[in-house]
Amino acid sequence: MQTTANIPTHKNKAVELWHKFIEARPYLVFFVGLFFVIYHFFGVADALLGIIFLFFSRTIIEEPGLSFMNYARRLGWFIVMALCATLAGLQEFLFVGVTFFYLFLITLTQSDDYLPRNFYWLGMGYLLLLIYPVSIPEIPTRLLATLLSIACTTLFIYSMRAILTKTGKLNVFARDREYVRKAFEDISKQLVVLAELGAVSVAEVQKTEGFTEVADARFTHIADADCVADLPDPSVLQRKIRPKQTYRIAQEYAQLEYGTVFRQRGLLSGRQCYTFALLLCCEQLADMIHATSKDPHAITPEDQQYFTDLADIFADYATGRITKVSQMAATLETFIESHSFADTCHRESWNGVLEALLRTLRDTRLSRDESTPFIKSVKYRIMFLRDNANLQNTQTRFALQLATIVSLAALVDVLLTRLVDMPYGIWIPIVAFTILNTYNDETLKSTANNAIGTLVGIALFALFVHFIPSSFLMPVVITVGYLIIVMNIAPIASITAGTQMALTALYSADAALSTTLFARLALVIIAAMCVVMVIFVFMQTQRSATLRTKISELERIDRRLITQIHFGLKHGQVNLWRTVQLLYYMHMSSGFMEDLAEHLDTKEAKWESRPGRSKSVEQIKRLKHDVDRVLALNYKFAMDAEHAVMLLDPRRLHDDSLSDPHPETWVTPDSTARIKHIDATNERLEEKLHKLETMQHIEKDD
């Protein structure tokens, strides 16, 4: 019985592996071509570039939104990598110094808390090229090999993008529309629940007074209820309204796009701004639905009709009955003109957000814009580094730790080479670099995986050498090894395959097999010792410290956001691009903090059963409580900030106002009621910002 039950699981795994193999075939074919072409013309010293560029191509193909200019800027770093590796290989102790500065700067500038391992292939490429150092006369050859790799990789990437886009497997615009559809569907469902909640409240009054009318035919079951006791429970309906569910859709989109955003030096492209702005509008609608649901007795039959009609519009787009954005915009415009609230505050709130949504829907030019301004992106990245390049920041501490440990491993390599003439000691810093992760527990787990994968890899390599002729050893091992790595079966499998490729580079037909295998094992052990000896004493990175820096980052974003809103109150409009950018990073920071808090839950459950950890468990509970408070306060602040931004949308201004050289004379179409509503929103923002600023920081661990 047990064996039979396991058959579907094994079958599913086999199917999954087959799909991974199918997806990996183009990469494998290109890798074999690139690696062996460079190997044939330039030798094994530069053929290692093929490995790096193939992994790079896999990442970039899966991020189709990156513009060519940003892609070219990214490729420029590979030229820097090749030059630094060449410079470091000219002299032994120069190698140690260059390694420290290169890895520190690459880690600091090419990764952050959201993409902590983004520097990996630039660092690994640098170290792999040091396996075979070149002399000064050979530098042009290496640069030529690098440029050839760049040209071939670019051709491959854009060919794959074209094929995947044509087959529908990869379409960034379709992916964006799917997120918008998901958010619209969520809003539609919540509007229906809100209308039903209003119908229940009206029915309660009407049952008491002897009336049974409802505003919408969909709620006749409420009118047909025999008595008030048979009506749906309002509290149950209120629980169905979940505004944070819409917020999480925007968070999910923000996290999905962050790889591309980072490679754009941290700026959103027009397409990303367009989609994220639509999701922000949905967030605002969800927040207003939630606010309205708190007082269901104030929902009139006319309000119910408003909500049901609006729900139909969003449902039509979500289900595909409305397929064009222009059609959605026209339908929404008709709705705004024909529907309204009697209550002034409700009218200004809902109309302000729906008008912002309408203006965004019509800005279709922005939805196709994949570019980011070069100068602005450089300025933004400098500002980001100025804010975060300090010893309190987790990634800065990790950059120092990584650079120090790998440089120490490089020094051990130099000393062993000089003292005992150990060949290929470069694998010590390579292994140290491979197993290091941001947090110590991740590093220890990676060390264990490396140890197991290395032992298995050594055993398999001994078999390969025994059965495969030496002339076929490199083509077979390199090809199969790369296939296993690119299929991403499991960490240990990837390390085993990597060991095969490493041993192939180390192994010489003239050397004894036992000597090669022993050298590989010894190098891994030495590298692991270098890492373990340092990670617990130098620049430790803890999740509690990361949470503290994220609190500070959220406060900084909030202050900058309210500065933009104050500017908007003074001049009648905000800088829409800047505010959307700030709201994007607010979503990223809060999502990152939620992920760290989930890890704290796991840690707490693990330590609660240990009597000696009671103090640590208490610290974790206090930390979680503080994080929850910060996230709750920041969510409320974000909702009011978004509302103010939409009310101060610069697109509300008349075209003639936009060309006026004196901004203080601009005339906006705002009514007195809307101005009062904006002032009230600003007061709420100031109050919530004060709560965030006066809240005590997270307590430090004892």
Where are these regions (language model features)?
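Pore- and pathway-forming membrane helices of multi-pass small-molecule/ion transporters and channels
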Residues: 2-13, 22-65, 72-79, 96-142, ...
